[in-house]
Amino acid sequence: MENTPKLNVPKRKPTGEMRVVYFSSTTENTKKFCDKLGLPATRIPIKLSEEIEVDYDYVLICPTYAGGLDDFKGSVPRQVIKFLNKVQNREHCVGVVASGNTNFGETFGLAGHVLRAKLHVPLLHVFELIGTKYDEELVRERIHKLWNWEE
């Protein structure tokens, strides 16, 4: 059990500028949240035929796509899965923030929990829809702490 990574502890200290990579559907809720963070941000394309590759550390901000109640399938958007299937993109992810809708009950923010477990990175926060001023401040603070984390 000693080799099991701790889920909310960074695996390493991020390097370079604080950045976010995010996915936002055509509703642009996640984009609106990211715009308010005031950090350099890269958007994962909506079209599955388009690809991006990053060469810098980042926090992934991802909406949750799940049907609610007991429908836990498909919580991470396909575009995000495709982006993370590239080893370089996956290795540069140092943390996750998720959004969701509390109307969907137990699946609220589920993408964040799935990604945290798969990527072995901390889940920094889960916010609803476009978030609040409090969510923005908390995410900025936690990203800053992550970049300044000491082992």
UniProtKB/Swiss-Prot annotation:
This is Protein NrdI. It comes from Mycoplasmoides gallisepticum (strain R(low / passage 15 / clone 2)) (Mycoplasma gallisepticum). One of its GO terms (biological process) is protein modification process. NCBIfam families: nrdI (TIGR00333). GO terms for molecular function: FMN binding. InterPro entries: Flavoprotein-like_sf, RNR_Ib_NrdI_bac, RNR_NrdI. Transmembrane segments: none annotated. Probably involved in ribonucleotide reductase function. Belongs to the NrdI family. Pfam families: Flavodoxin_NdrI.
